[in-house]
């Protein structure tokens, strides 16, 4: 990172970042290949999109691309001819793909350098456990007990490419880079019938860069307004976010809501917790039904008026946690109200006190999981196990290892469930599916195969889970039944494991 820092240093009196010359440097294409793509997708990279490519020719491909960019007239080819005009064995689409990834890497480095410089001289607390997906659930368990409503919003996608380009203008001031990026984006996406919601982009890094830029602009504005309009002169956000005519846009937004003065009034309440996940976001607060409806229409008008993005009111759901369930990261979350009667006695008088105990309840969505298992041919739609015929060509040990891995991953992730009954049902489906698969491979019945194999097969499914729990809890506590009734949140789950992928 230090060797590339000099390329991003600029004269702060002019406040300009000239990124366009970096597209003609071969070293940055190497950085995009080594640093970027291998981390996101190790089994696939941009240089391997062409079947005839060999690694030793990577430098030659980059040099040809740079030479072709110098010859601008030869780079511009109609979209319909993109795939019919190969250049030295590679299509123009292949080169547009390389440029798009390079643009994402360059801008990411620029933002990271600014972010590091903004924290110089400050002490930052490092907590690697907060990276875990399960770390959100203890937070919600602690905070949602004091709130009664949750606004569940599906973040809309921009319907036009120019909206994405305009979003980048707030952070990238180099006009040449933006024009070049706009040209490549339109040419590439027109050929591929671009749809950001369907993720038809071949480069995961480029897609994440566009999506995060879009969401970052939305979040920065929302969090900015949440601190009330009296903070408009705050300069704390200038380090990370650079906008064009930022104050003017805020004034325009206020004019849009001139007929809704009460909508902006609810922003005075600082007790709003915000969480974003899987293209959705939730806001937890303690409000009245009237204020929650105002909050809903605020989101709709914010997206339509400021971001020029159509947001249907049906995509903004208001959930009352005591009555409704919230689908959150694979769990069905809600607040369970348990009545509690306490007998109190003062001197000679005794009386009963009715109290309500609020508990954060997390359940396993058994219907959706069975649907996923049915789609992958582990069971039918009713949840009855079937044999996995596509795995019968593998060895017995490999088949058992695949099923045990899937069962272990599910047990590991859904260990935070309040009720383990549904988890045991999923384990039963996988165990019996494994037995049926092995019996089908050996052309035997399930009963005869289990009689010949014994109980050793079923013990393998319990060994993996037992080893994990025994490393955390003492043996006496692990052996007790109380452990299986309590929820366990693991802080080492950084991503969702593919249940079927065995590579």
UniProtKB/Swiss-Prot annotation:
It comes from the Eukaryota. HAMAP family: MatK. GO terms for biological process: mRNA processing; RNA splicing; tRNA processing. Disulfide bonds: none annotated. InterPro entries: Domain_X (IPR024937), Maturase_MatK (IPR002866), Maturase_MatK_N (IPR024942). Keywords: Chloroplast, mRNA processing, Plastid, RNA-binding, tRNA processing. Its main location: plastid. It holds the Pfam family Intron_maturas2. It is found in: Plastid, Chloroplast. GO terms for cellular component: chloroplast. Coiled coil: none annotated. The keyword Coiled coil does not apply. The keyword tRNA processing applies. Usually encoded in the trnK tRNA gene intron. Probably assists in splicing its own and other chloroplast group II introns. This is Maturase K. GO terms for molecular function: RNA binding. Belongs to the intron maturase 2 family. MatK subfamily. The lineage of its organism: Eukaryota, Viridiplantae, Streptophyta, Embryophyta, Tracheophyta.
């Amino acid at each position: 990172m230090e060797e590339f820092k000099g390329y991003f240093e600029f004269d702060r009196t002019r406040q300009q970042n000239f990124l366009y010359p970096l597209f003609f440097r071969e070293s940055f294409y190497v950085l995009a290949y080594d640093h970027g793509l291998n981390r996101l997708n190790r089994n696939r990279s941009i240089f391997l999109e062409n079947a005839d490519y060999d690694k030793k020719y990577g430098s030659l491909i980059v040099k040809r691309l740079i030479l072709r960019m110098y010859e601008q007239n030869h780079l511009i080819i109609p979209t319909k001819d993109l795939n019919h005009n190969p250049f030295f064995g590679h299509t123009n689409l292949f080169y547009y793909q390389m440029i798009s990834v390079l643009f994402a890497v360059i801008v990411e480095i620029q933002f990271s350098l600014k972010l590091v410089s903004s924290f110089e001289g400050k002490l930052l607390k490092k907590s690697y456990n907060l990276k875990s997906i399960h770390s959100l659930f203890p937070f919600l368990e602690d905070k949602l007990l004091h709130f009664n409503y949750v606004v569940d919003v599906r973040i809309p996608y921009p319907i036009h490419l120019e909206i994405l380009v305009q979003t980048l203008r707030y952070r990238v001031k180099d006009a040449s880079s933006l024009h070049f990026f706009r040209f490549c984006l339109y040419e590439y996406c027109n050929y591929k019938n671009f749809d950001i919601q369907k993720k038809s982009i071949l480069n995961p890094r480029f897609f994440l860069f566009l999506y995060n830029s879009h969401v970052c602009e939305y979040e920065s504005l929302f969090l900015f307004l949440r601190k009330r309009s009296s903070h408009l002169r705050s300069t704390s956000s200038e380090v990370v976010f650079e906008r064009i005519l930022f104050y003017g846009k805020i004034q325009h937004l206020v004019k849009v809501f001139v007929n809704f003065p009460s909508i902006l009034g609810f922003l005075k309440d600082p007790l709003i917790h915000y969480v974003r996940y899987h293209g959705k976001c939730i806001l937890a607060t303690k409000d009245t039904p009237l204020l929650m409806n105002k909050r809903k229409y605020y989101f709709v008008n914010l997206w339509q008026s400021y971001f020029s993005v159509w947001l249907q009111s049906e995509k903004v759901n208001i959930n009352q946690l005591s009555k409704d369930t919230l689908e959150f990261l694979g769990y069905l979350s809600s607040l369970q109200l348990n009545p509690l009667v306490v007998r109190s006695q003062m001197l000679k008088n005794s009386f009963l006190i009715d109290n309500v105990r609020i508990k954060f309840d997390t359940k396993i969505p058994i219907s959706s999981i069975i649907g996923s298992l049915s789609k992958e041919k582990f069971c039918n739609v009713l949840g009855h196990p079937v044999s996995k015929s596509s795995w019968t060509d593998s060895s017995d040990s490999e088949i058992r290892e695949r099923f045990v891995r899937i069962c272990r991953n599910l047990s590991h992730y859904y260990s935070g469930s309040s009720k383990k009954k549904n988890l045991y049902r999923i384990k039963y489906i996988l165990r019996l599916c494994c037995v049926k698969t092995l019996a089908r491979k050996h052309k035997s019945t399930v009963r005869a195969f289990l009689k010949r194999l014994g109980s050793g097969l079923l013990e393998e499914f319990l060994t993996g889970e037992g080893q994990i729990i025994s490393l955390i809890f003492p043996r006496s506590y692990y052996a007790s039944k109380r452990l299986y009734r309590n929820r366990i949140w693991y802080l080492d789950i950084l991503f969702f494991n593919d249940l079927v992928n065995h590579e």
